[in-house]
């Protein structure tokens, strides 16, 4: 697997649960196959959108195994990050053993290391696990940005081949792209609403929430942008804009799970402490999805 694999659309997969909050592996398998058939470029299970924070280690790896087994021709990039370096290393090693093609590692959260500690954390995993790895900057959840200098330094590691940008700061993303463009390094949007401007700066695609429910349109948008057809890409951005915004009207993945239920893809059941979507937001989401079907 080369860094070129990290170009295009990679759905941050939801995880289906039954009414007792058990993982529904049969539906998960169907979901993975549906996304592959829609033309996505890879799958990202057990990330934030997949509710990895509520899973045991064994459940986490079972989800990876199910997705790996379900698909034929697209890479599986398993979430394996933690705020505990030993835990991140264990999850990464087990994901590799389960057949993952690559790893997505959120930056350490809650204990909020300084840049030196963050770089050591990532290098420890990259030195030990011989898979391509994407570092994930989402300060709204972790409490701290990955410093640009840290990202630039990590881009020199042969196993660290990508950066998921979810800070909402286009200047920061642009600087990372500019300073790593000579490296074996790809920058992917982690915010659907910013995918188009990030690609315009030199990004290579997205790890997408919206692609769970609108994979074909998301693939078309990203494909047009990567081909330089920004007129078509803008048209698709306008079509999907309300969806991008509504999927974050409450904490992700609450709205996307409701959307999956509305589209009869899987149940909206989530694990506690996530709550069902508020009624007024449910109606707003229903209208957005209905507009996309007209």
UniProtKB/Swiss-Prot annotation:
GO terms for cellular component: cytoplasm. Pfam families: DHDPS. One of its GO terms (biological process) is lysine biosynthetic process via diaminopimelate. Its EC number is 4.3.3.7. The active site is at 136 (proton donor/acceptor), 164 (schiff-base intermediate with substrate). It is found in: Cytoplasm. The record marks 48, 110 as: Part of a proton relay during catalysis. Pyruvate binds at residues 49, 207. It comes from the Archaea. It catalyses: L-aspartate 4-semialdehyde + pyruvate = (2S,4S)-4-hydroxy-2,3,4,5-tetrahydrodipicolinate + H2O + H(+). SMART domains: DHDPS. Keywords: Amino-acid biosynthesis, Cytoplasm, Diaminopimelate biosynthesis, Lyase, Lysine biosynthesis, Schiff base. InterPro entries: Aldolase_TIM, DapA, DapA-like, Schiff_base-form_aldolases_CS. One of its GO terms (molecular function) is 4-hydroxy-tetrahydrodipicolinate synthase activity. PANTHER family: 4-HYDROXY-2-OXOGLUTARATE ALDOLASE, MITOCHONDRIAL (PTHR12128:SF66), DIHYDRODIPICOLINATE SYNTHASE (PTHR12128). HAMAP family: DapA (MF_00418). Belongs to the DapA family. Catalyzes the condensation of (S)-aspartate-beta-semialdehyde [(S)-ASA] and pyruvate to 4-hydroxy-tetrahydrodipicolinate (HTPA). This is 4-hydroxy-tetrahydrodipicolinate synthase. It comes from Natronomonas pharaonis (strain ATCC 35678 / DSM 2160 / CIP 103997 / JCM 8858 / NBRC 14720 / NCIMB 2260 / Gabara) (Halobacterium pharaonis). The gene is dapA.
